[in-house]
Amino acid sequence: DKLYYREIISLYPKFLVSHLPENIDNKVSGAQSLLFPRGKYLNYIHLTLPCGNSKREILKKEMASQAKGIYHLGDSCLILPYDYENFEIIKSDSIRNLPFVDTLPIPKFSSWEGGVFPDFYKKAVIYLLDAEKGRFLPDDCLSRNGVGLPNEWVHGYTKGLVLYKYYVIYWLEVW
């Protein structure tokens, strides 16, 4: 919700949310998944906004120079094996991650799979801005058992954005 957006991003250290829009009051939101930081669960912000051609080109140029990695969802990546709706680790996805332990994690974006956007997994471009291992929120706001990533990533964060057609999806995930 737009009402909670500013409040939620204010709860995170500035460096974690620096890539997110400061406010979304005047923007039409495509979809939002905003979760107040709390323990036991993955803390995340997924924000989808419409993105016109000129804004898209500006973002592409900025991201090309700022991103630590540029991916497509079919690439060999360390994927967060997490079900956001049920707050559960998807064990089969967790096992699939083992060969990619040395890569930086990105979200799975499972809510975009199939449905209204059947070509999302083929055409979306992921710009990973940063990901680090460690504790970046107070202990009582961190997931207690990790999120199904290899042990080296028991706590950490990933942030970035996805460009897909006329949308930009911003993400931050902290565990």
Which ranges hold each PLM region?
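Surface-exposed acidic loop/strand-edge motifs in secreted or periplasmic proteins
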Residues: K2-A124
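Short, exposed beta-strand-loop hairpins at the edges of beta-sheets
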Residues: P150-K165, L172-E173
